């Protein structure tokens, strides 16, 4: 099978037209997936005379988890920095704009040009974090991923830009497989 990854509408539409599946970038929110990505894939499929049947979507999600408040906070800091890094990229601005956060992209881009990488993460509010990431205790992750994406994706790829206990991920993956 051939898959393409993307964020922008044109690449996404091309993937719908010529591929067997699409890999959503981690910098994709549920709203962006439903309102931009899936319609673009459907347009591409229609151009090729195909439906979405059998087409696979690999869904995105940052995951912020830990067994206590200190672990959750450490995970949140790493994830905020990664979201900020992606958010500084002008090509990804439409994702932020969809949520009314276009001005945050301007600030992130300016800070990136100044080399202020750590400061960038402080611009990612709790609202932004919770929009891009599933945040919670390990037992809350699989149900929330399923709630957000279970009806529109066939596979999930999650991103956790921080170190943590491998056993925690085993539990999350087992819960996802049984969901």
Which residues are covered by each model-predicted region?
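Active-site-adjacent structural elements that line small-molecule/cofactor binding pockets in enzymes
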Residues: 1-179
């Amino acid at each position: 099978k051939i898959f393409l990854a993307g964020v922008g509408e044109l690449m996404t539409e091309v993937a719908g037209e010529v591929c067997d599946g699409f890999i959503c970038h981690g910098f994709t929110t549920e709203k962006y997936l439903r309102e931009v990505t899936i319609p673009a894939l459907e347009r591409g499929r229609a151009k090729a005379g195909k439906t979405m049947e059998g087409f696979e979507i690999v869904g995105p999600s940052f995951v912020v988890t830990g067994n206590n408040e200190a672990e959750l906070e450490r995970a949140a800091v790493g994830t905020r920095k990664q979201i900020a890094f992606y958010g500084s990229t002008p090509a990804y601005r439409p994702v932020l704009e969809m949520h009314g956060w276009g001005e945050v992209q301007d600030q992130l881009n300016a800070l990136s040009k100044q080399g202020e990488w750590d400061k960038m993460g402080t611009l990612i509010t709790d609202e932004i974090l919770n929009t891009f990431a599933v945040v919670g205790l390990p037992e809350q992750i699989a149900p929330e991923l399923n709630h957000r994406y279970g009806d529109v994706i066939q596979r999930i790829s999650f991103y956790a830009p921080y170190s943590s206990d491998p056993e925690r991920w085993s539990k999350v993956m087992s819960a996802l497989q049984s969901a």
